Structures are given as C-alpha cells and as structure tokens.
Amino acid sequence: MAVTFKDVARLAGVSTQTVSRVTNGADNVAEATRKRVNDAIKKLGYVPNKGAQMLSRAKSRIIGIVSLDISLHGVALIANGIRNQAHEMGYGTALTVLANNSIDEFRDAIRELIAQQVDAIIINAPVNQGIAKCLIEQFSQLTLVFIDVPEGTPVNHVRCDHHTGANLAVLHLIEQKRDSFVCISGPSESTASKIRYDAWQTQLQKHGAKEIACYEGDWQAASGHRAIKDLVLKGIDFDAVLVANDQMALGVLCALSEAGINVPKTVSVIGFDGIQDSQYFSPPLTTIKQDFDRLGRKAVKLMLNQMDKPGEIISEVLPVNLVIRQSTSEKTDSSYSKQEVLACLENIRRLLP
C-alpha cells in the first residue's frame, strides 16, 4: 500500500498541512519540525506530491539508473547499453552510483532519482530477493526493472544465461582432460556469481573432477592475482582455473606468468563476460561471452513496455556463447606440475656422486 500524507503526519506528530509546507519547501516551518517530517518521509519512503504529480501528469522522459561502481567493465557496458537505447527512444538518463548494497543505500539512490523526476528506474546492481520485494512495495508508484536478482524473484528483470555459460566453461575444460580445478567466484551478494559457481560445482561433481580450491573475488583483477599467488606459495597443484569474470582472469594470468607457470600448457584459464579487451590478454582469454549492450537495451524495452501496459511480471534470459582462444588447450602427458619438476630434480640430485 502506498504511503500517504496522513502516514507521514501521524509518524511526525504534525498536521497534514505541515507536511505539505515541508514538502513544498515553505520557510514558515520550525527547523525541529522540518527535521521530524523529513525523518518520517525517509523512514516511510514517502514520495512528496510534487514528484508524484509530475510523474502522473506528464512524463519527464528520463530513465533512472541505480548502478554499482562503473569502473567495473560489465556494469559500465550495461549502463552504456541502457543509455544508448534510451536515447534512441527519445529518453534521457540519470545515474546514481551505490556505495554499498544495503537496503538504505538503495532507498537513498531511488529517492535521489525521484527528486530528478525520472519516469522509471533500472537497478544495475545485485539485489537479494528480500530487498527487491521491499523496493517494489515501497516505491510502488514507479516501474522498477532489475538486472541481477535471484531466480524466481517476483519482479521485472533481465539477465544473461549464467547457468548455461558456467556449464559450457566446465565442459570445455573437461573435454581438454583437465581434472584439478580452482574456482574463483565473484562477491557472495551477486546472484550472477552464485548461479555460475553452483553450476560449476554441479558439472565438476558430475564428471568426477576435483575442486582443489575456491576463492571469493570482488570482480577486480587484483583479487584473481591474490588467489593464484596464495596457491603458488602453498605449493598446491592444479591444471585449470574457472574465473567468474574476465577482469579477475586477467589477474590470474598475471600471477601464473609471474610464477613461471605456462598457460595453457600447464594450466588452462577460462573467464566469463567476453569483454573486448580479453582478446588482447597474454595469452588471449578463452571466455563465456554475454552481450552487455543487449542486456542494457533489453532492460529499457522491458521497462517502457511495463510503463505503457503494466501487467504480469516479465523475466527475460539472454543467451551466452563460448569463445575459445589461447588460454585453454588439451592437457598432454608432456605437461608437468611445479611439484613434479621439483621431485624429478631431487631424484637426479640423489643419483649424482
């Protein structure tokens, strides 16, 4: 149920006329009273009439975007797809970037966009089911479209087929006779990362492959680098690395190179995203490609369709595909681990006089 003037007035302990004066920016309100009203508005998630009337009387033709840090390649490419599609359809865009994934941060971001009188909002950030439902209920006057929510969440959303992509990655490495896997996932709050990791686990178990180690990364290259450096320092042997995005895979390749481990002869590495730069990694990265631009564009089309003809909840899943490059190859009997080489050298030393 939508929050009303009366709800705000009741919580703040003032009249509805006072609430009206505060929301209209009138000067003849005591600061203590103004603070109580604004605190009540914030707590209840109330949208002042001025914004609500603007939304109902005439469209501003502005689409709001709530986003993660746009220094992340995937996030930035999705936002770019949203902007491009919006502009082609005669809409402007307004962007706000989250400091974290808390419910309060999402609420503040949405209120900031409402203040700019946006027509609807696309949430370009991971949201759990509870927060998604809360936002839909609290901001019921707005059309919200999500991009990273758990499967089965009753909200409008668009996503790529993370499950199929993760399956393709494991099967590709299994076909290359790899059997000792390291998994580097994304942040635990990301639904996309969880789907990928769960699919990896299912396929590894199905084919009898070993998960040697698992690390949780943060989508940045440095976290992939740290994971591999830790494994090398511990002397742990592995022959394949599944990475939840291409940026972390860049860090993986760098760490393996620093350790003198050959890719793909000794260790095969596969990423996820298919960002354009991945073809220029050393070696060029095998990856699961998802179309970020199309994802952003689809979100805009779904949103506008729901604005014009609100009805049943829509969920769209976009396909992905495997792009094979030089970071993966078939394991051969001539490949040796670091531990095997050290053992061989030790045996030779013992035979010497």
For every predicted segment, state its role.
Residues 232-353:
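Flexible loop/turn connectors
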Residues 1-60, 350-353:
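N-terminal helix-turn-helix DNA-binding module of bacterial transcription factors
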Residues 123-168, 247, 273-285:
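Flexible loop/hinge segments that line or gate small-molecule binding clefts
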Residues 120-121, 126-133, 182, 194-276, ...:
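Hydrophobic alpha-helical
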Residues 169-209, 213-214, 314-330:
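An alpha-beta-alpha
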Residues 156-183, 201, 221-230, 249, ...:
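Hydrophobic alpha-helical segments within soluble ligand-binding/sensing domains
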Residues 36, 73-91, 165-169, 191-210, ...:
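Short, solvent-exposed amphipathic alpha-helices that sit
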